[in-house]
Amino acid sequence: MTLDLQTTIENAWENRTNLSPVDATAEVREAVEQTIAALDLGRLRVAEKTEAGWIVHQWIKKAVLLSFRLQDNAIMGQAPMQFYDKVPLKFAEYGDTAFQHGGYRVVPPAVARRGAFIARNVVLMPSYVNIGAYVDEGTMVDTWATVGSCAQIGKNVHLSGGVGIGGVLEPLQANPTIIEDNCFIGARSEVVEGVVVEENSVLAMGVFLSQSTKIYDRATGKVTYGRVPSGSVVVPGSLPSEDGSHSLVCAVIVKRVDAQTRAKTSINDLLRA
């Protein structure tokens, strides 16, 4: 079934400029709908971690993009909280039974779009989770945090207030941004452009990471890009230019996570009971 969906999506993608709510075939509509529904339930995800590393299923991302060509805008919600959009809200039709089955908390006015997966014991404070995102068990998405389209958030992650996790839809990115298990992302930090923060890492308040951000390891003196090694403690910093005329923003790995760091950033099970 997945192979059939993929083939239909790939073929539709090649013809995407000709797609519209009027012109799309029933086969394409059904393939896109099934893919979005599977994303919503966590049966499919845009990226998966394997022994060889992260694998990105580009065809699923294409299905998300195609969904915008197949839907007309419609009014959703009720005054004074009315919206006009193509993507339904994830919880629009939920009743008490559906929320209990989901096993997560949604604090008003948190918003998740249909096609985002929210796992058990997740807490959504007043935040935003975009289509295609995957938020795994025990994670806290704190107030005014944003989980971008197709972003992958691991288990027991804390996204602090105002954190931004970048999406892939605009500007169009090849790979999703990934925050692995047991990470703590400090307030107002931004991780975008497909950067991977490996498991058990801690980003201090105000760390900004894109593919062009230098990541400086204080212990080794090495500079890398696009990936924070597992167990890193990262703070904002700057590095001087070669001629010493100016400095540019960077992220600095100051140490590896230790017991003291864990004590300061551990999650509170009482909030997930």
Curated annotation (Swiss-Prot):
Domain of life: Bacteria
A Pfam family this chain is assigned to: Hexapep_2
Stored CDD domains: LbH_THP_succinylT (cd03350)
Pathway: Amino-acid biosynthesis; L-lysine biosynthesis via DAP pathway; LL-2,6-diaminopimelate from (S)-tetrahydrodipicolinate (succinylase route): step 1/3
A molecular function (GO) term: 2,3,4,5-tetrahydropyridine-2,6-dicarboxylate N-succinyltransferase activity
Leading EC class: transferase
Gene Ontology CC entries for this record: cytoplasm
Locations listed in the record: Cytoplasm
SUPFAM superfamilies in UniProt: Trimeric LpxA-like enzymes
InterPro entries named in the record: DapD_Trfase_Hexpep_rpt_fam (IPR005664), Hexapep (IPR001451), Hexapep_transf_CS (IPR018357), THP_succinylTrfase_dom1 (IPR023180), THP_succinylTrfase_N_sf (IPR037133), Trimer_LpxA-like_sf (IPR011004)
Family assignment from sequence similarity: Belongs to the transferase hexapeptide repeat family.
Name this protein carries in UniProt: 2,3,4,5-tetrahydropyridine-2,6-dicarboxylate N-succinyltransferase
Organism in which the protein naturally occurs: Bordetella petrii (strain ATCC BAA-461 / DSM 12804 / CCUG 43448)
Gene designation per UniProt: dapD
